[in-house]
Amino acid sequence: MKETENRGRVPRLRFPEFRESGEWETIPLSQLAKRSTQKNNRGELNSVLTNSAEFGVVDQRDYFDKDIATQGNLEGYFVIEKGDYVYNPRISKMAPVGPISKNNIATGVMSPLYTVFRFNNSHNDFFAYYFKTTGWHQYMRQTSSTGARHDRVAVTNGDFMAMPLPVTLLEEQQKIADCLSSLDNLITLEAQKLGALKTHKKGLMQQLFPA
């Protein structure tokens, strides 16, 4: 990759094969995705998912160590399929305007307080990584207000879906996503190695000193 001089609609770093591909476009989310408003009307789904700022979309039981939602009120929850995205308006230090995450685990249901949407193109990991940046935060601050509880962002569905997103060629999007994904895999592998080394050290310390 090479740093480019144009800092407008062209990123600072760009893969060589895309340097002459022109500027990126800015397209509203509504032209790239659709809101998913399917409700769990018959209560057939009972796997409740949540979107945390730190871990993304996770099973509620794993995150809270218990079921927060009860079976009786799941019929009003949104159905979220694997590959869907979800916006949690809850404000935190890690997510000052709330996190947007991709559901990479399984089909389940989400609180109606969340916004669930689905990209038209299934190859959309590029946007999953974009939503981990702060590039969209300014728009959310400008078009939303803090809710009555002062811990949630209040934004209309129309304003949320009008969010401008940076868009480039699908090939470049995929290249970026693949690059960042490979780094994620490397980080995971190194973390596992570090964990193994810590365990090995602990075992040595127990054996190198008299009990």
State what each model feature region is.
Residues P16-E17, I68, T115-F119, M161-V167:
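Short, well-ordered beta-strand elements within core beta-sheets of diverse protein domains
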Residues R9, T107-L113, S145-E171:
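A short glycine-rich beta-alpha junction/loop motif
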Residues S30-N41, S52-D84:
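Sequence-specific dsDNA recognition surfaces
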Residues L13-E17, I176-I187, F209:
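Hydrophobic structural patches
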Residues R42-T50, Q142-S144:
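Short coil/turn segments at secondary-structure boundaries
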Residues R7, K175, I187-K202, F209:
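Extended intrinsically disordered, low-complexity coil regions enriched in Ser, Thr, Gly, Ala
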Residues V10-N40:
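Non-catalytic DNA-recognition/assembly elements of restriction-modification systems
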Residues E75-W136, R149:
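A short beta-sheet element
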